[in-house]
């Protein structure tokens, strides 16, 4: 968005591009996220390969009920992996000639309250300093941006949930053409997908469980039980090629702005992945921040920056 408005940016990441593009992440995009990607000019492949869903199903008490999103809200969601979104954004940056640096270390946001903030980092054993106007801290829960805010200013609120979230990827067609959220006495289950031939399935598990305790046979048996017989009858099982257990937490930090530093996404707030909200909230943050910075640079209007993160904003 900033590049389209003629605003130069530099992207720093402590991981390699190969590592970033190989991570398994979120896959359900809300309407506002799709609109933001359209505005950024990176939605061509999304529209070609994404899977539009008009609703989803809830399964509980031995029955399942479809919720008609399009009918009730006039909006749909799109299944398109975060990994693919990232690839599209990287390709757009390359096309636009925007700078980005991977495998950086010892990143330090500095002089945040001054008119000339900077970011120090080390790459290939050499130290660099980037002078800038503003810093967007989009570096996730474990990044350095949030902790650059002084301890006497930063407030955090969090809750760790007493269960884990076991997810697998399998190259089998999805059990249902839309997502299925299943409530069962054994725990929650979610049937999602990444494509018409690749499925992403989850079950709630004990917080102390390990992946080795969940061989595929055990997963499929438990997943089928929680889905219920009607849906499970359509389930195609097979060998998973990706399996992990994630702890579930909720987390909020404030303020999201300190001087010339703005936090966005998981750096500022985390919600459990069960609702597919994390990526969508992050892009909503960036959409608001981009609008504010574009107004600053193209119109000399700082009203949006002054109000950013301090008052309710529409998230369409």
Question: Predicted segment positions?
Answer:
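A conserved FAD-binding loop/helix module that cradles the flavin
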Residues: 277-283
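Active-site-adjacent segment of FAD-dependent monooxygenases/related oxidoreductases
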Residues: 22-25, 30-92, 96
């Amino acid at each position: 968005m900033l590049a389209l408005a003629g605003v130069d940016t530099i992207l720093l990441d402590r991981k390699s591009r190969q590592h970033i593009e190989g991570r398994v992440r979120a896959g359900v995009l809300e309407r506002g996220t799709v609109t933001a990607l359209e505005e950024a000019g990176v939605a061509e492949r999304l529209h070609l390969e994404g899977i539009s869903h008009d609703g989803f199903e809830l399964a509980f008490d031995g029955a399942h009920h479809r919720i008609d999103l399009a009918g009730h809200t006039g909006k749909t969601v799109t299944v398109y992996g975060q990994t693919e979104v990232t690839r599209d954004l990287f390709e757009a940056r390359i096309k636009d000639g925007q700078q980005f640096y991977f495998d950086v270390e010892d990143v330090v946001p500095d002089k945040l309250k001054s008119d000339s903030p900077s970011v120090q980092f080390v790459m290939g054993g050499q130290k660099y300093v980037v002078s800038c106007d503003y810093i967007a801290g989009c570096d996730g829960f474990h990044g350095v941006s949030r902790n650059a805010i002084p301890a006497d200013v930063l407030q955090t609120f969090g809750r760790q949930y007493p269960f884990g979230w076991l997810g697998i990827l399998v190259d089998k067609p999805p059990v249902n053409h839309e997502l299925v959220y299943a409530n069962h006495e054994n725990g929650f289950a979610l049937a999602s997908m990444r494509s018409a031939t690749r499925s992403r399935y989850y079950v709630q598990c004990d917080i102390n469980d390990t992946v080795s305790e969940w061989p595929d046979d055990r997963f499929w048996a438990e997943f089928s039980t929680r889905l219920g017989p009607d849906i499970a009858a359509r389930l195609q099982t097979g060998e998973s090629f990706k399996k992990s257990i994630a702890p579930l937490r909720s987390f909020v930090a404030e303020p999201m702005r300190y001087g010339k530093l703005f936090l966005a996404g998981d750096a500022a707030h985390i919600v459990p992945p069960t609702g597919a909200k994390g990526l969508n909230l992050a892009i909503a943050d960036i959409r608001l921040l981009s609008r504010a910075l574009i107004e600053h640079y193209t119109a000399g209007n700082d009203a949006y920056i002054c109000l950013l993160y301090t008052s309710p904003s529409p998230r369409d």
